[in-house]
Amino acid sequence: ELIHYIISSTEEKVGCLFLEESVKQSGLGLLSVQASKRFHITSEDDRDWTIDDKIKALDELRNLEQVVFWNHFGSSTLDNLLTRVRYMVKGLDCQYIILDHISMVIYETTNERKAIDDIMVKLRTLVQELGIHLIVVSHLSRPQGTGHEEGANISLNQLRGSHSLAQLPDMILALERNTQAVNEEERNRTCVRVLKNRFSGESGPAALLQWTKQSGRLTEIPFNLNDDDTNEDEEDE
């Protein structure tokens, strides 16, 4: 959704370093968003698309040259990653870089905290040098009590691995969803929470996104304040 939004609303190029999926999977996902069809569902009994739908989506996505995928599956060394990012920016003119996810970057130490500290410092330095937008995906530590898969609120100290994950970024967004809810509509609803905003200081719940099974798309929906579990400070904002 994010990649599709960027290339549909701007002329900027996006460099994608998705370390947990293949280029084929990434491209198929982008086509699915364009067509509002779940092209990854291949069972004849479950799928609601045809080959013609896929061809049409590819024809419609004329701005596909704005997307650059790194053809790599699995972990990568830090030096290799930094070189790829620099090439995407300097050689291919990408202004947006998406790294998913930071824990897949291999570092020559068994100390995860030290490794992520160094990775984040070097990525931040690269952002300042190149003047780019860098989006980094991070996993979370397990909270005590209710788990994140049951919709527990996310805090900065749950970013897994290092305090630098919270200190160095300009903006930190958390995606919260109760994947175990009995109600299907609630189960497919995601809250976007701003944990850090260096630009204006505004924080708290920012948007609700509803996933639709038929289209596989996310759509922003209004907040229901009666169901909001935010604290008083967040409600005042």
Language model regions located:
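Cytosolic-facing regulatory segments adjacent to core modules
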Residues: S8-D93, Y107, A206-L208
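A structural motif corresponding to the C-terminal end of an alpha-helix
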Residues: E60-F69, L126-L134, L165-D170
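Helical hairpin unit composed of two closely spaced alpha helices linked by a short loop
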Residues: C94-L134
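Generic enzyme active-site microenvironment
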Residues: F18, I98, V137, L168
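C-terminal regions of RecA-like/P-loop NTPase motor modules
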Residues: T42, S76-I97, Q128-L130, P143-E237
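P-loop NTPase Walker A phosphate-binding motif
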Residues: E1-S9
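Conserved H-loop
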Residues: L19-E21, I132, V136-H139
